[in-house]
């Protein structure tokens, strides 16, 4: 039961002293990649940080960003004559069945460039151009992504209990070399795996022991 002094405090309009935690500015925690955490400026906005690090805050213009989803094509020297090499590249860049019509200033048709189907040699011989990293942070992120992809590609998944028992039965009968005979054994190889598949199961079994 409250005494008279406590009742007077409750009825009084004078505010009581409390800790001013509400006015303290909370420190923002930066989650995500370690490289970005180390280079983050806490005094700048998210868009400013991403622009400084060479990253995109928003993927395209449609979602509210400043980057255009379909940038305006370059119109420099579009009236000049194309070289034979440029003409071949333009034909290969167009899908089959599509064409580009070139006109003069009066609207008369000068040339119709039809798209050509790419051969397998064209795809294999085409050089892949790698754009240089804009900033040191982007270079570190790209290097980290390459290393992570290499680790995942070299990592073998362990066999399930069914796969382990499946390949073990075949190894007990045929050994660890004759995978073609394993593939022909329709009784033990009920899933009809080929020799390459059975060999891969054996390699994974050895690697994950």
Swiss-Prot record:
Record has Kinase as a keyword: no
Keyword Calcium (UniProt): no
InterPro entries assigned: Ribosome_biogenesis_Nop16 (IPR019002)
SS bonds (residue pairs): none
Subcellular location: Nucleus, Nucleolus
Keywords (A to Z) from UniProt: Nucleus, Ribonucleoprotein, Ribosome biogenesis, rRNA processing
Family the entry assigns: Belongs to the NOP16 family.
Physiological role: Involved in the biogenesis of the 60S ribosomal subunit.
PANTHER family with a match to the protein in the record: HSPC111 PROTEIN-RELATED (PTHR13243), NUCLEOLAR PROTEIN 16 (PTHR13243:SF1)
Subunit structure: Component of the pre-66S ribosomal particle.
Full protein name: Nucleolar protein 16
Organism: Schizosaccharomyces pombe (strain 972 / ATCC 24843) (Fission yeast)
Gene designation per UniProt: nop16
């Amino acid at each position: 039961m409250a005494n008279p002094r406590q009742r007077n405090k409750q009825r009084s309009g004078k505010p009581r002293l409390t800790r001013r935690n509400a006015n303290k500015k909370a420190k923002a925690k930066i989650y995500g990649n370690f490289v970005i955490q180390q280079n983050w400026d806490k005094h700048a906005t998210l868009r400013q940080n991403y622009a400084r690090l060479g990253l995109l805050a928003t993927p395209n213009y449609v979602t509210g960003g400043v980057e255009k989803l379909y940038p305006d094509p370059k119109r420099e020297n579009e009236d000049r004559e194309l070289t034979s090499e440029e003409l071949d590249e333009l034909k290969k860049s167009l899908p089959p069945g599509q064409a580009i019509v070139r006109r003069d200033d009066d609207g008369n048709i000068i040339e119709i460039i039809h798209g050509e189907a790419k051969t397998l040699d064209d795809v294999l011989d085409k050089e892949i151009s790698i754009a240089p990293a804009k900033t040191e942070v982007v270079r570190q992120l790209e290097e980290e992504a390459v290393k992570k992809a290499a680790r995942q590609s070299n990592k073998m998944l362990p066999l399930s209990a069914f796969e382990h028992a499946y390949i073990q039965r075949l190894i007990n009968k045929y050994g660890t070399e004759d995978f073609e005979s394993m593939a022909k054994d329709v009784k033990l190889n009920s899933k009809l795996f080929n020799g390459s598949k059975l060999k891969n199961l054996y390699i994974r079994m050895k690697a994950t022991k």
